[in-house]
């Protein structure tokens, strides 16, 4: 009798609040099969993600070798689960160097082809003809149904800064007004920071903070706006957190970075104000520097309320900034598992995505992708 009771206890189903609590500790990649056990389990997974341990934006790090066949690998960090995974997938057809822009866009461009991907896990690649004008190191942005390509280094008639727009609906390129003249001396993407919302592309010159916005629907530039927080900020980048533009600035000078701060951009009818949101703890600033005594640049990948910051010259440490309670900054760091002595010379591209169960289900259903814990 006691053995029967023990057996019944061991086989008792887990349900309700207990099941949701258990599922809140399960990595997101394992919640896909869990949600398919039964309808009650599916409901428990959804409830657990909504109330106990919500999904957080993933950072996805793409690497590409610099020699033929230019193989690519993809790793993703899930902050909800504090877990790195390698995403095994079919090789990406090589067009040129793999690059990323404004957190969500991956692209490759050559004189003949332009390839791009913008879904959360970059499962799908789109191939188009190359822009009319060839240029190296341009700025590239996806705004709504338009891809904008501008700047770079080239010589195109009387217009040194050609600008082209690709319409996703028609599959055609159009030329339009060039970058504002004030940005022409900094037209390469390495000198500019790009951010987008649903209607506009925002371009900031990293040193001066001079910013313009571009609306591809009517091909109109707006600005200039001054987004330099102060004279003690020697380099800054822009992004979006909780649908609000933010500025991340390096304090001091290129030889001696003394700090990193975050500001919210508040735009009025005629002026732009900056409100300080937080300052990175110094121990994280030192991690950001890595082995180098200097911190000359900073890069941002952001989505929702979470920003990932890294040093382009020393990307071994990733700094997390989570905006909570509207405007408070919660700081943390995680080691970039992609960076090691073997692949130190490979090309890195960073994207940030809201990866949900549907995105993971699509990846699993393809049959040729696997998620492997690192």
Regions found by a protein language model. Name each.
Residues 25, 31-37, 148-149, 201-203, ...:
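Hydrophobic, repeat-rich solenoid/adaptor surfaces of innate immune receptors and signaling proteins
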Residues 32-50, 77:
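Short helix-loop-helix/strand-helix junction enriched in hydrophobic and basic residues
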Residues 53-82:
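An edge-strand/N-cap motif at the start of beta-rich repeat modules
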Residues 9-14, 28, 48, 87-95, ...:
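Short loop/turn motifs that recur once per blade in beta-propeller domains
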Residues 71, 87-261, 329:
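A sequence/structural signal of beta-propeller blade repeats
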Residues 7-15, 27-34, 156-159:
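Amphipathic alpha-helical protein-protein interaction segments
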Residues 259-374:
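C-terminal closing repeat unit and adjoining cap/tail of repeat-based domains
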Residues 1-16, 21, 369-374:
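CRL adaptor-proximal regions
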């Amino acid at each position: 009798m006691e053995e029967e009771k023990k057996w019944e206890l061991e086989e008792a189903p887990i349900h309700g609040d207990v099941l949701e609590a258990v599922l809140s500790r399960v990595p997101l990649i394992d919640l896909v099969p869990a949600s398919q056990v039964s309808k009650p389990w599916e409901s428990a997974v959804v409830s657990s993600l909504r109330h106990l341990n919500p999904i957080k934006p993933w950072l996805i790090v793409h690497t590409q070798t610099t020699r033929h066949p230019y193989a690519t690998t993809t790793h993703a960090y899930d902050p909800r689960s504090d877990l790195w995974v390698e995403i095994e997938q079919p090789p990406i057809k090589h067009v040129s160097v793999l690059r990323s822009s404004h957190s969500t866009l991956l692209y490759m461009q050559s004189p003949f082809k332009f390839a791009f991907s913008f879904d959360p896990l970059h499962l799908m690649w789109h191939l188009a003809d190359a822009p009319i004008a060839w240029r190296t190191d341009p700025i590239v942005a996806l705004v709504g149904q338009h891809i904008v390509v501008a700047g770079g280094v080239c010589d195109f008639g009387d217009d040194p800064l050609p600008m082209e727009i690709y319409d996703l609906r028609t599959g055609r390129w159009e030329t339009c007004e060039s970058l504002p003249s004030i940005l022409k001396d900094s037209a390469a993407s390495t000198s500019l920071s790009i951010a987008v919302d649903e209607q506009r592309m925002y371009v900031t010159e990293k040193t001066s903070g001079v910013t313009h916005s571009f609306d591809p629907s009517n091909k109109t530039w707006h600005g200039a706006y001054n987004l330099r927080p102060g004279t003690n900020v020697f380099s800054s980048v822009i992004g979006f957190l909780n649908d609000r533009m933010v500025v991340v600035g390096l304090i001091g000078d290129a030889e001696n970075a003394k700090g990193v701060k975050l500001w919210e951009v508040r735009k009025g009818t005629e002026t732009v104000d900056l409100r300080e949101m937080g300052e990175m703890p110094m121990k994280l600033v030192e991690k950001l520097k890595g082995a180098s005594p200097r911190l000359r640049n900073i890069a941002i990948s952001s989505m929702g309320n979470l920003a990932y910051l890294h040093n382009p010259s020393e990307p071994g440490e990733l700094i997390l900034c989570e905006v909570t309670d509207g405007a408070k900054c919660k700081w943390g760091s995680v080691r970039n598992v992609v960076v090691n002595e073997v692949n130190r010379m490979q090309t890195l591209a960073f994207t940030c995505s809201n990866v949900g169960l549907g995105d993971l289900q699509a990846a699993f259903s393809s049959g040729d992708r696997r998620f492997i814990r690192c």
